[in-house]
Amino acid sequence: MKSELIFLPAPAIGHLVGMVEMAKLFISRHENLSVTVFISKFYMDTGVDNYNKSLLTNPTPRLTIVNLPETDPQNYMLKPRHAILPSVIETQKTHVRDIISGMTQSESTRVVGLLADLLFINIMDIANEFNVPIYVYSPAGAGYLGLAFHLQTLYDKKQDVTEFRNSDTELLVPGFANPVPAEVLPSMYVDKEGGYDYLFSLFRRCRESKAIIINTFEELEPYAINSLRMDSMIPPIYPVGPILNLNGDGQNSDEAAVILGWLDDQPPSSVVFLCFGSYGTFQENQVKEIAMGLERSGHRFLWALRPSIPKGETKLQLKYSNLEEILPVGFLDRTSCVGKVIGWAPQVAVLGHEAVAGFMSHCGWNSTLESVWFGVPVATWPMYGEQHLNAFEMVKELGLAVEIEVDYKNEYFNTKNDFIVRAEEIETKIKKLMMDEKNSEIRKKVKEMKEKSRVAMSENGSSYNSLAKLFEEIM
């Protein structure tokens, strides 16, 4: 009888890619295993559509893609932003239940487990109904998990965690060797209007799962991983990363060719790459400061600059129609020989290019792992979600990044945004980021971690062995 795992990623590209790549890894490591991935589309994230098409165009044996019915964006337009994604997930539960019901009744298939994204953990009720073991996948790192479990524990003990908001408090958090400043806590955990009680309910349920699979590796987060393992109230931990989509998603191939062609013409280790994720957008005054800082630094650059979502619109915009309207007068002409401003970027291909020597990033966890895999030092510019915590971990805990600023908040996720990072700060940190290995301890450490990341995924490496133990648990 065929063994089948069901994967349930959250409907956002950063969550989806990691789980699909992990499904491919599972299949490659176990010849008697098949995986079915349920994909639900988030109306704001066009990347899900593009990635989904690439999966259907290039099918993987024993990997089945099931597209859940698309939801009407109008159902969510009046909801507060923090409530949109949970609502999208909730509407899919009936469809998920019907499909799982059919799969568990099959005489040719044995469903050995359901692997759900952290945000999909409430699907546990359905798994329990059909006696299917449930496992949790965390697309974020072990440090973030440790903090979230810690805040959930404080909340359950009736401590008002919202008091940490805008405070100078430093927290002693299991999983962090250094005190964690309240200013880097993910805002959704300390905001009474941000759905924090819902988030804590997810981590409470997460404790009931069979195991937690994390996209990280022992050598990157040893302190945080060990802390999670020592907590008897947390299920077994399996670090199996870094899990990355190193082939890209096939979208915008013509644009990618132009960008990579430009990089081919640049000297080795000469370019700083600026890219801030799907929701990483700036107001015009901040764009101008970044431009001035880049120009003053004297370094070659590739800058992925995307516009904010216009009011009344629901989909992400890939590029500006006229860059001259938002950049300083004459900037494009003055920097035409050393820089290129783009919209969408083939991030993995760019980071893997020999011309790229530095990465100014929003510090999403996938981007952080990609920078480590390719050995490219990061200048941290966190904007929303857990990114401030990731930046703190990379800079203070691990010594793998240059800090630009941790107070900036993206206007999409915050109603007030009057903080500006000045050109002088940007210029200084770019120069520090781009120092060569002789003068940069950070660059040396990142190079060492690059090698460790590859060893972790190789035979008998830490993540390789962790996955083998997970198979013993599942099968």
UniProtKB/Swiss-Prot annotation:
Matches recorded under CDD domains: GT1_Gtf-like (cd03784)
Record flagged with keyword Glycosyltransferase: yes
Entry keyword Glycosyltransferase: yes
Gene Ontology molecular function terms on file: UDP-glucosyltransferase activity
SUPFAM superfamilies from the UniProt entry: UDP-Glycosyltransferase/glycogen phosphorylase
EC number(s) recorded for this UniProt protein: 2.4.1.-
Pathway terms, separated by semicolons: Secondary metabolite biosynthesis; terpenoid biosynthesis
Function: Probable component of the triterpene saponins (e.g. ginsenosides) biosynthetic pathway. No detectable activity toward protopanaxatriol (PPT).
Homology family: Belongs to the UDP-glycosyltransferase family.
Binding site for UDP-alpha-D-glucose: 278, 344-345, 362-370, 384-387
Keywords linked to the UniProt accession: Glycosyltransferase, Isoprene biosynthesis, Transferase
InterPro entries from the UniProt entry: UDP-glycosyltransf_plant, UDP_glucos_trans, UDP_glycos_trans_CS
Leader sequence segment: none
One GO-annotated biological process of the protein: terpenoid biosynthetic process
PANTHER family attached to this UniProt entry: GLYCOSYLTRANSFERASE
Protein name listed in UniProt: UDP-glucosyltransferase 102
